[in-house]
Amino acid sequence: MAVFPLSAKHRKYALRALAVSIILVSAAYIALTERTERVRPQRVEQNLPPLSWGGSGVQTAYWVQEAVQPGDSLADVLARSGMARDEIARITEKYGGEADLRHLRADQSVHVLVGGDGGAREVQFFTDEDGERNLVALEKKGGIWRRSASEADMKVLPTLRSVVVKTSARGSLARAEVPVEIRESLSGIFAGRFSLDGLKEGDAVRLIYDSLYFHGQQVAAGDILAAEVVKGGTRHQAFYYRSDKEGGGGGNYYDEDGRVLQEKGGFNIEPLVYTRISSPFGYRMHPILHTWRLHTGIDYAAPQGTPVRASADGVITFKGRKGGYGNAVMIRHANGVETLYAHLSAFSQAQGNVRGGEVIGFVGSTGRSTGPHLHYEARINGQPVNPVSVALPTPELTQADKAAFAAQKQKADALLARLRGIPVTVSQSD
């Protein structure tokens, strides 16, 4: 069990006390060694009371982290963390039947916030159902445990990686602990120029991407901010840029001169005429479940019945009801890219081979939805990736955007320069 105090002030005092203790112990040791012949050693045994949250004298709130063991239930983990039995009973009686609280993996951790009075205030942990990571957050208010709608304490840090290809690019990136979603996004970003699988021994990949941390543990990867691939001595670069007018709708990738990086394998058609982007790709608070989860696509708000079009040529591989997606269509495209269109009110007559721009359905609110919109996903080899990197048209930069892009690129260039000449590196920068 690990305990993490929240107060920086208390940590400072603790470090000072530790330093003083080391000095005193060292002095005592020196004094004792001068009198070893006069002092007879004695063995003293004393039974200590069990660890308890109450009456510890700790006045500040702190997080307790408890690792899940094979076969553990949530009640087992909470009991081992020191939570009172009656509190555990209140949680399990109210939420014990919910799937996300029943299925715990042995490689995850449960975090409990302990208040200054020694009582539990919050419980947080991630679940992974069918590749979708969800944050389960419970909080106690007015003596009642309920699902928390407060923001999770997640920190985003840019992560730097420099990898020299040995046998294969994907294998070398995996050994350097580059997440699979980053590997597949990288493949999509440069798909119009070369295949990631075509890199040879001695080629290099340098990456800057966002990583999300929860209580000090990396839980997910965000967008690739900059990428540099040296293939056969030729350098290829991609830079992520989002203009102010795009708001929360996500950005796009451009080369070092601010030009559109690629044609994205024929993805030059928006899937619909939309009002606004209501939810981008990435972590968000789910409006119905009130849990933080990885939103694996982009939501486009649009009126009921708005035509939805295939974003590129492909083959319809699924058309029908698909759980929380409601009415959905899936299309397989070239280069291992697959797109999904969800919450449709109805389907068109399209089936089999479809052309880019062909109507495949109509906007609706079927499945788990709060109102009419299109949920649009892109996957590469089954792995969800940000659609802007592979499956949406990229707009040309305006003159105003070019100046902002140049300033942003300059910062990324400085970080990439640090990585050149380093075979494998891992670092974060605040």
Curated annotation (Swiss-Prot):
GO terms for molecular function: metal ion binding; metalloendopeptidase activity. Pfam families: NMB0315_dom_I, Peptidase_M23. Its EC number is 3.4.17.-, 3.4.24.-. Its main location: membrane. Zn(2+) binds at residues 295, 299, 375. GO terms for biological process: cell wall organization; proteolysis. Likely to be synthesized as a proenzyme. The cleavage of the N-terminal domain is probably required for the activation of the enzyme. GO terms for cellular component: cell outer membrane. The keyword Protease applies. Keywords: Cell outer membrane, Cell wall biogenesis/degradation, Fimbrium biogenesis, Hydrolase, Membrane, Metal-binding, Metalloprotease, Protease, Zinc, Zymogen. The keyword Ribosomal protein does not apply. It is found in: Cell outer membrane. Its cofactor is Zn(2+). Monomer. Has both endopeptidase and DD-carboxypeptidase activities. Degrades cell wall peptidoglycan (PG) to allow consummate expression of pili. PANTHER family: CELL DIVISION PROTEIN YTFB (PTHR21666:SF288), PEPTIDASE-RELATED (PTHR21666). Belongs to the peptidase M23B family. This is DD-carboxypeptidase/endopeptidase Mpg. The lineage of its organism: Bacteria, Pseudomonadati, Pseudomonadota, Betaproteobacteria, Neisseriales.
